[in-house]
């Protein structure tokens, strides 16, 4: 199977690949046909989902406000749809449930001429790999979020920006970034002049390069600036940069475009662009390039000057690279990265503006008052009425993203998991009080990508992980945590080929159901400890495809990606059979399934035919038949 054909398989993080695998016949009775007992669907109607928390925000990459109402804002979560506040962030309400087919929001825009008109572009633009959900085009509301209509552009997948004509809400532009996994034609700048009923692709560079940003001159909305980005996500690498990148300008509402090059780098990666509402001749661009940095034009894009080359402004460019011009002061501009940075001297120097959470992705500033703004980041959205000196809370947004969840056997039982870009959590499923509050949950070690494991009958000791093979033991009785890494080396920035073990970002940690003092941890091999992590032993060979050509730098050709999420050919799921000690299943991120029935002395490749290089996200052993497992 060629790369283009198998990338879609790798991207389906949550897809259910279900196979019944009959590998052995433990007893004659299991070989006999058993009578079926159909379940009446009516019995399930009384079961309803309820939110148990924790009430702290998850990743968001899109916000917008209503210029004439300083208390009304919209937030787009990367997995939870669109949320709205009408009290300045004191409370939030989901307004997209029941209308949207997908939950990942990439861009939001409110019409300045009619705040009842809201456009939403689906599909988050920061391409995080398997944890990134694609979108299904554009949605529109004409009643301030009460109802929504789907407007098409389903195959654009990731949308980075939506711009609306300031005086005509039927004229709207969409910056389509495109499919992160493979080339596709549905990327570039789309325009509609009839409120989204029809769309025209008015700027298209090639099938590998999409629009990473779009800015409109509000004093003359026929002038547009578009940033293009050649990029691709591979499971083992983020490709950011190429000949298809660049900055483009239109002076006729998108009918024709000119590439702006004078003073800009030749080969570029991701770009953020913004024209100043205070001075339409002032245009900003944050550019990823070997000779990149923060660029300024004072002649409406004809010529450019690099005014700042600090690496902190363009670090991890594929994940950030956002520029927001102050609506009142042409010398004031914001750059969003891990920190929110502000310049008041035309981009020459920047100072950080503290936000409630790091990894900042969006900022909307009220055009009438530059002290009123809403910011979003990996912890949710927050509103400020004093230019970022103080912010509203993120502890009122049930939009967290969890990598894995597991329960114990206490009463009431607790649910454990790792929240993306936040801590691990153990939270009560119910309480004797009026609700589940902050006092009813606590962190249990590890970090955002925790894969918790414990004795379900006595979860005093919790084993939880983090990226690059970090694993800790948390003692809830003493509230202490200790590092028990199998190989205590943090290889940030190192090529996986140079590491002893290749650990997935969400590396499995499993406690044996037969002896909870035994824990398993997986890299490219399966590791076992029988003494609470004091010592580890390898109980398998490399169970992955072990493709050496995929063990190089995590990013390129311009910027390396150092955090470790691109480490590939790893074991992604491990489960020991509840029926037999020593019977262990292991699935990898490259589509292999292995089984041992003797505690790891021998392994059998039991990969079902036809899977290809897919992500084995979960393996469930049947509680009724030890010979059956589901992928």
Residue ranges and their predicted role:
Residues 1-10:
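N-terminal secretory signal peptides that target proteins for export/translocation
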Residues 11-26:
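Bacterial N-terminal signal peptides
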Residues 24-34:
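Bacterial Sec-dependent signal peptides at the C-terminal "C-region" and cleavage site
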Residues 32-631:
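Beta-propeller blade termini and top-face loops
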């Amino acid at each position: 199977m060629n790369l283009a054909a198998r990338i879609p398989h790798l991207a389906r993080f949550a897809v259910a690949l279900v196979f019944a695998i009959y590998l052995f016949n433990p007893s004659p009775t299991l070989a006999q046909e058993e009578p079926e007992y159909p379940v009446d669907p009516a019995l399930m109607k009384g079961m309803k989902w309820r939110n148990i928390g924790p009430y702290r925000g998850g990743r968001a990459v899109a916000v917008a406000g209503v210029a004439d109402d300083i208390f009304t804002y919209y937030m787009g979560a990367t997995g939870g749809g669109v949320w709205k506040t009408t009290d300045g962030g004191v409370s939030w309400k989901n307004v997209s449930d029941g209308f949207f087919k997908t939950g990942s929001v990439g861009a939001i825009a409110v019409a300045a001429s009619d705040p009842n008109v809201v456009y939403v572009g689906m599909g988050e633009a920061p391409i995080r790999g398997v944890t990134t959900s694609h979108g299904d085009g554009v949605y529109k509301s004409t009643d301030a979020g009460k109802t929504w209509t789907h407007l098409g552009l389903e195959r654009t997948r990731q949308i980075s920006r939506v711009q609306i004509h300031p005086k005509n809400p039927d004229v709207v532009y969409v910056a389509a970034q495109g499919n992160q996994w493979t080339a596709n034609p549905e990327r570039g700048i789309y325009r509609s002049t009839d409120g989204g009923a029809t769309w025209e692709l008015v700027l298209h560079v090639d099938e590998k390069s999409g629009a990473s940003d779009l800015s409109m001159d509000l004093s003359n909305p026929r002038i547009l600036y578009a940033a293009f980005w050649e990029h691709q996500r591979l499971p083992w690498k983020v490709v950011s940069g190429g000949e298809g990148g660049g900055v483009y300008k239109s002076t006729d509402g998108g009918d024709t475009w000119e590439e702006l090059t004078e003073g800009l780098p030749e080969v570029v990666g991701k770009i953020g662009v913004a024209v100043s509402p205070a001075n339409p001749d002032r245009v900003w661009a944050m550019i990823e390039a070997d000779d990149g940095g923060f660029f300024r034009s004072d002649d409406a894009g004809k010529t450019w000057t690099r005014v700042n080359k600090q690496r902190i402004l363009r670090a991890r460019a594929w994940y950030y690279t956002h520029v927001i011009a102050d609506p009142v002061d042409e010398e004031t501009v914001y750059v969003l990265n891990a920190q929110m940075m502000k310049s008041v001297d035309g981009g020459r120097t920047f100072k950080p503006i503290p936000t409630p959470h790091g990894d900042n992705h969006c900022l909307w500033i009220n055009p009438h008052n530059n002290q009123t703004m809403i910011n979003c980041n990996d912890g949710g959205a927050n509103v400020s009425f004093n230019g970022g000196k103080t912010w509203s809370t993120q502890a009122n947004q049930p939009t967290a993203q969890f990598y894995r969840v597991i329960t114990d056997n206490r009463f009431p039982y607790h649910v454990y998991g790792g929240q993306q870009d936040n801590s691990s959590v153990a939270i009560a499923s119910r309480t004797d009080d009026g609700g589940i509050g902050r006092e009813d949950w606590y962190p249990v070690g590890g970090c955002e990508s925790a894969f918790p494991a414990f004795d379900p009958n006595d979860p005093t000791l919790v084993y939880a992980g983090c990226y690059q093979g970090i694993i800790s033991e948390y003692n809830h009785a003493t509230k202490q945590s200790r590092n028990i890494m199998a190989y205590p080396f943090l290889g940030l920035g190192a090529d996986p080929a140079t590491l002893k073990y290749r650990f997935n970002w969400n590396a499995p940690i499993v406690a044996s159901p037969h002896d909870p003092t035994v824990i398993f941890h997986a890299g490219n091999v399966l590791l076992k400890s029988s003494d609470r992590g004091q010592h580890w032993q390898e109980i398998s060979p490399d169970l992955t495809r072990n493709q050496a050509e995929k063990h190089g730098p995590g990013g390129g050709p311009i910027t390396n990606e150092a955090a470790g999420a691109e480490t590939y050919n790893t074991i992604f799921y491990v489960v020991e059979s509840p029926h037999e000690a020593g019977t262990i299943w292991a699935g990898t991120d490259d589509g292999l399934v292995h089984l041992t029935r003797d505690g790891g002395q021998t392994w059998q490749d039991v990969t079902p035919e036809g899977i290809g290089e897919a992500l084995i996200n979960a393996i469930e052993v049947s509680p009724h038949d030890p010979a059956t497992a589901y992928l």
